[in-house]
Amino acid sequence: MIDVGSLSKGMYIKYDGDIYRVVDVNKHFRARGSGLIRTKLKNLSSGLVREVNFNSGEKVEEAEVTFRKASYIYNDGEMYYFMDAETFEQYGIPETEIEDEKNYLVENTEVDLIMHDGKPIGIQLPTSVVLEVVETEPGFKGDTVSGGGKPAILETGLKITVPFFVEKGQKVRVDTRTGEYIERA
């Protein structure tokens, strides 16, 4: 059991019989009283995010999760399949459990499988991935005055804003935490 005051973003806890990833933590302290810890927890089995308030001093159980290196191999419309890098065993994860992460997956993307009781319950992406631009408008000379960018659609269907000099067919590096363009690859 761990004190809720030590919760931080990215931790995994057991709460109400399910496993949750801590998405956000805000600590509020009142004068002459106990503090209030406001959290956003993502249920790893349903994908739903819920807000839970704890009083300081409460305890929660830390979930025992392990991480295994794996590669994304394919999807069949409902399940996304990954191959363990050590044992070459294949694991299927329902699309609903990786709703946010699927926009960054192309064949052979290296990920960490989040395992609980020997079963995969989610994935952890690398901090950036390289994706190809499949659709964007051509840039025009003089467009750089605004300093903005133009919309682009990547090979996975992800829509991002890229600088004007990026053209269709080029590969770009995208931050998986924010979904923003980093650089040309």
Curated annotation (Swiss-Prot):
Location of this chain's protein in the cell: Cytoplasm
A Pfam family assignment: Elong-fact-P_C
An example molecular function term from Gene Ontology annotations: translation elongation factor activity
Pathway in which this enzyme or protein is active: Protein biosynthesis; polypeptide chain elongation
Any one GO cellular component localisation term in the record: cytoplasm
GO BP, sorted A to Z: peptide biosynthetic process
UniProt feature coiled coil, ranges: none
Keyword set, alphabetical order: Cytoplasm, Elongation factor, Protein biosynthesis
PROSITE patterns with a match to the protein in the record: EFP
Known role: Involved in peptide bond synthesis. Stimulates efficient translation and peptide-bond synthesis on native or reconstituted 70S ribosomes in vitro. Probably functions indirectly by altering the affinity of the ribosome for aminoacyl-tRNA, thus increasing their reactivity as acceptors for peptidyl transferase.
Protein family membership: Belongs to the elongation factor P family.
Protein name: Elongation factor P
Native species: Thermosipho melanesiensis (strain DSM 12029 / CIP 104789 / BI429)
